[in-house]
């Protein structure tokens, strides 16, 4: 089972279409989130929102690297 899981993560990590789709999905999700949050009344914490987004992105990439899905 462990070998099968390792083969699956290697095939996903080296897959061009999976990389493209995940990039498009994350880009669209961030854009929609930014538009929604920035348009809220009395919202003035732009740098906090950017920090949180950067932190979540970095932590997600680190987790994916540990699992073996992302290679960098």
UniProtKB/Swiss-Prot annotation:
Key word Cell wall biogenesis/degradation present: no
Keyword field contains Transmembrane: yes
Transmembrane feature ranges: 13-32, 47-69
Top-level lineage group: Eukaryota
Keywords carried by this UniProt record: Membrane, Transmembrane, Transmembrane helix
Main location: membrane
Lumenal side: 33-46
Membrane protein topology class: Multi-pass membrane protein
Membrane-side (Cytoplasmic) residue stretches: 1-12, 70-72
Gene Ontology terms: cellular component: membrane
Subcellular location: Membrane
Similarity annotation: Belongs to the TPT transporter family. SLC35D subfamily.
Miscellaneous section: Present with 98 molecules/cell in log phase SD medium.
Name by which UniProt lists this protein: Uncharacterized protein YER039C-A
